[in-house]
A protein has these predicted regions:
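Conserved N-terminal beta1-alpha1 strand-loop-helix module at the mouth
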Residues: 51-118, 124
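Hydrophobic faces of well-ordered beta-strands that scaffold small-molecule active sites
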Residues: 59-61, 90-94, 130-132, 150-152, ...
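Active-site glycine- and acidic-residue-rich loops that bind
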Residues: 64-77, 176-187, 206-224, 240-259
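N-terminal active-site wall of soluble small-molecule enzyme domains
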Residues: 94-151, 158-162
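Conserved anion-binding
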Residues: 99-102, 156-224
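Active-site-adjacent loop and "lid" segments of alpha/beta metabolic enzymes
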Residues: 104-113, 151-156, 212-216, 239-265, ...
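Alpha-helix-loop-beta-strand connector modules within alpha/beta enzyme cores
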Residues: 107-130, 166, 170-172, 223-230, ...
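Glycine-enriched alpha-helix->loop->beta-strand junction motifs that scaffold or abut catalytic
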Residues: 142-151, 167-173, 194-200, 228-231, ...
């Protein structure tokens, strides 16, 4: 454990004593050889003015779309391994229907009924929390019976009825910032979800349109959104997309994914979203911007240790 980590441990434990248990630090364990990794910290009492000293890291990972049993199980098994290795709680993510594919001929997914069966199986067989997105209000109720987090796609983040339906399920709602909105603009989707009864609302940065077939990330959006929501996620994979740049499909530059994560951390993000695949080049959706599953461990380790 380095000096900064030891100092943080001391500060959190001291604050826990000072506020009679209002701050709670988790343990520090030796996960691999002689390298010690800091576990996440979280404050119980958010009224404590020092709660920003510590950070709750949220990790979300999974294939862009549900493809087949082999891919699903390979990804889920790796997430279980990484959870044990790092003492974290990665949420399994995958879509049952990619309703916003560029081309009509592109693979969309297994559909609502079959997709929810797969996600329920991931929860049961692997013990992972799961997240999926919805595109229509009527999907919220059945999805809410299975998943832990309901995601609102970026293109749909201003759709009031969709947000309200997701919020009414009682599940955590993750709202992705549209490619045409600023961080400050996310105040309004957030307020819609809270007003509809959502107890926990996350906001996700995923870049902004920059001319044709390109996205750029204005990292100032992260602190802007942190002033709105406690938990702000960086979508490290969709932010490297090149929309429509691959002839009827989305292109991307996956080599920038690790840098996106570290830059987001520097700007105060406390969550990280990765679409991953055992063989992204053979993925049925968003292959060029998915992270190779074998590379996820190194990316997470870098986030936790730097």
């Amino acid at each position: 454990m380095n000096f900064r980590q030891r100092r943080l441990c001391f500060c959190v434990r001291s604050l826990g004593t000072l506020f009679r248990g209002s701050a709670k630090a988790s343990y520090c364990e030796n996960y691999s050889g002689k390298r010690k990794k800091m576990a996440n910290f979280a404050f119980v009492n958010k009224k404590c003015e020092f709660y920003n000293i510590v950070m709750r890291n949220i990790f979300i990972a999974g294939p862009c779309v549900i493809e087949n049993e082999k891919v699903t199980e390979a990804v889920a098994a790796e997430l279980v391994r990484l959870n044990k290795l790092f003492g974290i709680d990665i949420i399994f993510k995958s879509s049952f229907d990619k309703a916003n594919r560029t081309s009509l001929s592109s693979y969309r997914g297994p559909g609502l009924e079959k997709g929810l069966e797969v996600l329920a199986g991931v929860k049961k067989d692997f013990g992972l929390k799961v997240l999926t997105d919805i595109h229509e209000s009527m999907q919220a109720e059945p999805v809410g019976k299975v998943v832990d987090v309901i995601q609102i796609p970026a293109f749909l983040c201003r759709q009031t009825d969709l947000i309200v339906a997701a919020a009414k399920t009682g599940k955590t709602v993750n709202i992705k910032k549209a490619q045409f909105l600023s961080g400050e603009d996310m105040k309004y989707p957030y307020e819609k979800a809270v007003a509809a009864g959502a107890e926990e609302v996350w906001l996700t940065e995923r870049g902004n349109s920059f001319g044709y077939n390109n996205l750029v990330v204005d990292f100032r959006n992260i602190p802007y959104m942190k002033s709105i929501a406690e938990n702000v996620i960086m979508d490290c994979t969709h932010s490297v997309q090149r929309p429509g740049a691959a002839g009827g499909k989305t292109g991307g530059n996956r080599e920038f994914i690790p840098m996106m994560a570290m830059a987001a951390k520097a700007f105060g993000a406390n969550g990280y979203f990765f679409e991953v695949h055992p063989d992204p080049d053979k993925g049925l959706s968003d292959g060029p911007n998915m992270l190779r599953l074998e590379d996820l461990e190194g990316v997470i380790e870098n986030i936790l240790n730097n």
